[in-house]
Amino acid sequence: MLVPLVKTMAANRKSWDTFEAMRAAAQEGDAQAQCYLGVCYQNGQGAEQNHHEAVKWFRRAAEQNDSVAQCYLGVCYWTGQGVPQEFGEAAKWLREAAEQGDPAAQFNLGMLYETGQGVPQNYAEAVKWYRESAQRGYPAAQFNLAVFYETGQVVPQDFTEAVKWYLAAAEQELADAQCNLGLCYQTGRGVEKNPAAAVKWFIKAARQGNKTAQHNLGLHYASTEAAELAVLEEAKDAPQPP
């Protein structure tokens, strides 16, 4: 994945009844309100979309050490949205948030180290930050960490560990992870070969538009036995009547 990501606001953060109340709190210096206000301007929610205004409020919150705002600000510098693109500034703000434990920032910082944007390319550092993020439940980081284990780059090749992280991400509906998990079941790498389980995960990924899964699913359905097993696997996952 080569697109920087940010998370939605955490459930334990403040909320305001109206946009005006949030803006008033932001103007009074409330960092969380400033961060929310930045998101509103970025997405055009409650106000006309204005990326420069979004960056202004993200910066105010980031300078008060709000980790979510730091992550958003870092991504703005990474993508050049509302500010001139500057990878060094992106790395600076993402590191600030990552060191506070923000999983989206940790993932994005790992991406910078993997690609060598704003920091010297360093796969070991990339894996370090992907692991930190993955352990906090961030699915994109779980997927990237799984890929490192599957390929044996930087870390010892470990198909079982790859399956573990693919599964964690797949259960959070990440299509690429669902597809790769299906491939693991198809080939028996890191898990016992299971054509029905492979088809099950290919179906889940294919429904989200994953082209590789759609192709592999077509190949599997050429086998009547695999198709019948897949139907049984799908039935197991279906909600049961009371």
Question: What residue ranges belong to the model's regions?
Answer:
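Cationic, low-complexity basic patches in intrinsically disordered or flexible, solvent-exposed regions
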Residues: 35, 64, 71, 100, ...
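N-terminal segments that cap or nucleate solenoid repeat domains
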Residues: 2-43
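Hydrophobic face of amphipathic alpha-helices that form TPR/SEL1-like repeat modules
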Residues: 36-43, 72-79, 108-115, 144-151, ...
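Short helix-capping/linker turns of helical repeat alpha-solenoids
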Residues: 27-30, 43-45, 50, 64-66, ...
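Terminal, low-structured helical/coil segments at or just beyond the last alpha-helical repeat
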Residues: 10-17, 214-242
